[in-house]
């Protein structure tokens, strides 16, 4: 793995900056960190599975990225409903099951649902956290739900509080993220950091607006160079998403971000190594 660029599986923020790998000087063409998006998405590995995260770690991912949603409350051990790693609200695209994840018990998902690619089980947030900690990786976790109950907020906060986590949200999910921040503010020993996600739709948020959430921002790779410069000048750590191929990698690296979010860390590493 090259010194200048390492692969992350999500974003690390100011509160845990000292505990995370950092780019050499944030000046060179390839000095960005790389975030492994949902673990990995390849022709043989499905996103959000344990296989995808193991693949990311084998290819030197620095941060493990995932999205969290809640399964149905029921007879499972967790009375609030298990927190499942899933980008989609439904099981349709990734697995052989269908319907909203929130309508399924975790026990049923575990027994019945397998990914269309690779035939793997989905995993819970607690499974990802346990694995990541065992291999020394921090996390970037996105809240997808625009509304969560107070019980769900407490459940999520207790789950991630002992780990190096950057919690992220787009504009619609900020109310959910802010519930976590409120709980977190009362803990003097917290390790959680926070980041806003933006695709630039409706305009790029100002530095001041973004800093209301945290000192990091996840921005779509379509971000204009002028906006990128203003974010960096304003003290924001910019993570660009999502790199799917070599053309994307080159564009993202040219903007000299703090980190890049990529679907296939192995492919990104091969491209990066070929630049020398």
Spans of model-derived segments:
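Phosphate-group recognition and catalysis centered on beta-loop-alpha active-site segments
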Residues: 2-10, 17-276
